[in-house]
Amino acid sequence: MDRIDRIDKTTKKNRRLSLVVILSVLFILSFGLVFADEWKQALPGYEFSFARDHASHPDYKIEWWYYTGNVVTPDDHRFGYQLTFFRVGVDREPVNPSRWAVRDLFMAHLAVTDISGQKFRFTEKINRAGIGWAGAATDSYRVWNEDWEARQNQQGQMTLRAMQDGIGLELTLDQGKPPVIHGARGISQKGAQAGNASHYYSLTRMPTRGAIVIDGQRYEVTGLSWMDHEFGTSFLEKEQQGWNWLSLQLDDQTELMLYEFRRADGQRDLHTSGTFVDSSGQAATIAASEFTLTPEAQWLSPKTGASYPVIWKVSVPSRRIELTVRAAVNDQELDTRESTRVNYWEGAVEVTGTKDGRPVQGRGYLEMTGYAGAAMSAILK
């Protein structure tokens, strides 16, 4: 047993060292010299095509595939989950043809929230693509990081698989509603400068079944998931500190996505936006002037000292929507110093309120960045 423990500690130490090396490459190369290689910018006029656009877009510097969901066991034990795969371009056309050349780095985050048990668990991975440890296909949808994987099967379903440190998931997701493209003319504008944008779409209501694992215990579950896929090259501007982002699935079969950029001076950024999806899948953009997000209660992180709003009032008068959004568990902060080096809060939320004057309930996910540490504009510049 002592020998196994020593091997395990050595493996973890070596892994930490390899992460330091990879992160050094990421922050020296990825955010310094890469623009000389002319990564493609997210510009108006992009035409989405599915299922092609589920796959990777290696001409762009930054890309992520993001899944969240709220699921439940037959005996009403509730869970939330997040599985995200990130690709960051380092060298668009490496001079060195070696398989060890670093063209892209791949990070991945896995989190499971035991809502009924009031527990939150998180783990992460980071690898380079060149030697097959991680990657993303361009001819079909498959993205992976070691044994974590998201892919589309022959029936058009998404399958997710990830397991590490006593938490994991094995889920099958049906598409549900058609893809929702955010923004206008094929782009979601994030800043004033041309190219400070992304190509961004979502699958907003995906029937889900499979299994969740937490603390080594497996639970069979069903529920709903949400997928985001976003790609671009330069996203934010230096005045932008972070964002508050909500994806809400309401019990009247509608969905609401809102994001609010916060500036370093505390003011709301003009490039705040959102999307409303009706019960038939038709989507409409919500302008910044059409909604407000008001924090009602805070949670102080004992790990980072950051104060995160965990109750929000959401008002969209143009849609006659008035909601209260509450964190299902207050502590859903992700400490990602071994991968993206960004501490952020991302977790399951519960929704109550009114829509069109009638009571409505729902569930969803809330993401809050820029509350702990560096501004997000230093990362996604």
Where are these regions (language model features)?
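Structured soluble/peripheral alpha/beta segments that form catalytic or ligand/cofactor-binding pockets
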Residues: 35-381
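Intrinsically disordered, low-complexity Ser/Thr/Pro-rich tracts
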Residues: 17, 31-36
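Asp/Glu-rich intrinsically disordered low-complexity tracts
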Residues: 2-11
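Bacterial N-terminal signal peptides
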Residues: 20-30
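Bacterial N-terminal signal peptides that target proteins for export
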Residues: 10-21
